Amino acid sequence: MDLYSMSAAEAVKKLGSETDRGLSSREAEKRLGRDGENLLRGKKKKSLAAEFFEQFKDFTVIVLLIASGVSFATSFLEERGDFADPIMILIIVILNAAVGVIQQRRAEHSLEALKNMSAPTATVIRDGKETIIPASKLVRGDIIEVRAGDLVPADARLITSHSLFAQESALTGESVPCEKDARTAVKKGSEQAEIKNMIFSSTVITAGHARAVVTETGMDTAVGKIAHLLNTEDEPTTPLQIKLAKIGKALGIGALSVCALIFMLSILRGMGVLSAFMLSVSLAVAAIPEGLPAVVTVVLSLGVQRMAKSNAVIRRLPAVETLGAATYICSDKTGTLTQNKMTVTAACSASDEIPLTGDAAKKLFALAALCCDAKHTGKGEVSGEPTEAAIVAAAERSGTDTEKLRRKMPRTDEVPFSSERKMMSVAIKDGDKTITVAKGAPDVLIKHCTDIILNGRKIPMTSALREKILRLNSSLADRALRVIAVAAGDTKNGKPDETGLAFCGLIGMEDPPRKEAYEAVKTCRRAGITPVMITGDHAGTACATAKKLGILSRSGECLTGAQIDKMGENEFAQAVRTCRVYARVTPEHKVRIVKALRAHGEVVAMTGDGVNDAPALKAADIGCAMGKGGTQVAQNAADMILTDDNFATIVKAVAGGRGIYDNIRRAIHYLLGCNIGEILCVFAATLFGMPAPLLPIQLLFINLVTDSLPALALGAEMPDSRVMQRPPRDSAKSFFADRTGLDIVLEGMLIGALSLFAFVAGNSLFKNSCVELGRTMAFAAQSLCEIAHSFNMRSRRSVFSIGIFSNRKLTVCAALCAALQLTVMTVPPLAALFNVSALTPAEWLTVAALAISPIAFSELGKAVGGKRETE
């Protein structure tokens, strides 16, 4: 219904309510049951079972399930009753699925907690009484009261309003609070920004107070309609997910190909079909790193938990990897790069700038505070419209008790500020007389002044003095300060008299940059990341702040929304390469900026807090929503939520993302190298007509214990201290680039050769040589070689140069794996299960010599190849 086009009385009647009494509690309960709660609803949550079974879509997991099924079948057909292999495969697959579900739920709970922190209440009139209720219980027809500082709980038609201003940037992208008036007539079909007689859900009242009737709630509000559109969009696939899927498919196809080859070779050598099939299955088990999905998930989740402690809540685990590849960070100005708190930084008399701590400034601030509605809360905070809050805070800092001053000099009347007048004036009772105090835009207020206060004396205003004041104003404006003029005069009838005023001074204020933002921008530069400011503020203010922070270094790097609108696609595509500040832009411009940068192959992180920012957050590679000042819709659209709304947190998150990617790559490198070693060991033995050196259950133990535990510890490696001193990686680059693929194969060949040598030694070189002894030595050598090799994987530099035991988690995991290996080989029931026998000291000495060989060969290779650092 277009209730904004009706009078307030007609709207209230249409909604079946009463202006003074509101709805009855019974009627409100009835409407709540009919329309539902006043909440924004995201996508329908998947059930626990659905989330669990979704984990089984991974190609690697599917191959493991097939291997498990085949193993069950062969054990059954051979009537062995040995189901240990398939059961262990199933256990690890189920555990991996459980880990995935737990981490996803943990991220969802973090988000829910964030929403609950900002759960609003509403002041409502029901049964003729004013009461405070949860905003979720509001219904259409409720009469609500709003005042400065309130979050508007629902869309509502104003009934009465007094000097009302609302910050609608969350909805419209307009950074300046807009004036609202219950008496404004609005035509049907008007744009939302033109509807001045309504207030909208998720916007903030910055000044004044009003009574209104709720017209829409929940998903029917303006913000709800945008939320509904977002709920229909699917999450994009990240580069990490694509790469892992490719690795999984390659492993699966490779494993099946090798298995088929081994099966045919075995048949040709006269082996029975079932025996050949079991040998092929053992090779499939060796080829696939069963712990890989779980290791990646756990490494991601460990990184996410670490980042959450630094105020970055990750909503989607794979998005962490994308963060590490970011090449552009497009950030809002207000609240993210700046403190989002207007602060007085300059004051001028009629002749010159004056110290902020002097008596003249104290008197100026006190006078201006009398013409402000902002209030000092008594807790060191000031609530109200930002400009007025800055003036009151300055007065308090200079030693004026503003609340006491207002009681001593009460306001008797006022002429409120309006965008047309650009000034506000109040009548103040000062003892036996009444005075007028006015504040506003300097070029407007000076026209109302016939006198000037100079050195404590009132003298007539002259054209020369007027020009001097305007020059002072320009000087402050050139420093990107918002300037307010203050004037005072007498009044005779108790009402503000805006004629014949005496000019008192100028007050300059700004939203200062966050202290930590300076260093964060420098870090971006060192890391090859381009920081960009995108704001709805004026170009002059934006450029001044950007220069202070080091974002803007040359002229000609700023574009306004109006300039963007005039550009063709090709011209704009070229402009984004050099532009570092975008001013007076709309959320639609943000989407265009993101798409233009991505078209150049850039990986873009975009911040946003408003509902209209949601499309840009979705369009970006990494959407970063604000936790404090952000709307629920923006948070739902984002990949990451900054709980402190701080630019420096994004930069820390990028560093964390780089470190996590390094750890994932390190863990996968290690796992694949170990598995290639197992494949080559079994494959080579088959080619030479030897029995299988490793049994399926032994391979499973190696993959799940001596592979996976060190891989997890490698995933907990602390990021390189110089991680932000290198350029972003190319997100399109293969996982196996920069010789990584060759290294994996060479490392696998070494480990496989050492294990095969151990098998041959146990099978032929010792007095009690036999196949079982050979398998025992191969089993021990393969496990211990892989444990030793995990230390090589910490860095491409010498492991001794970084401290071989400096990763305590890896040291503990290595010791635990060695202890478990020893337990399996010495405890009789376990030894029988794994088909191993006890080793003599000479045999153990041989295994130990083979086990330390990977470190020796790795150190030799690093010394010859030079010190190449881990990427």
What are the functions of these language-model segments?
Residues 730-749, 771-777:
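Membrane-water interface at loop-to-transmembrane-helix junctions
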Residues 80, 743-758:
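Alpha-helical transmembrane segments of multi-pass integral membrane proteins
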Residues 706, 751-752, 776-790:
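Generic alpha-helical transmembrane segments
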Residues 1-725, 735-736, 749, 764, ...:
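Conserved cytosolic headpiece of P-type ATPases
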Residues 758-761, 783:
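C-terminal substrate-binding/catalytic lobe of Rossmann-fold NAD(P)-dependent dehydrogenases
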Residues 753-757, 764-766, 770-771:
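Catalytic cores of phosphodiester-bond-cleaving enzymes
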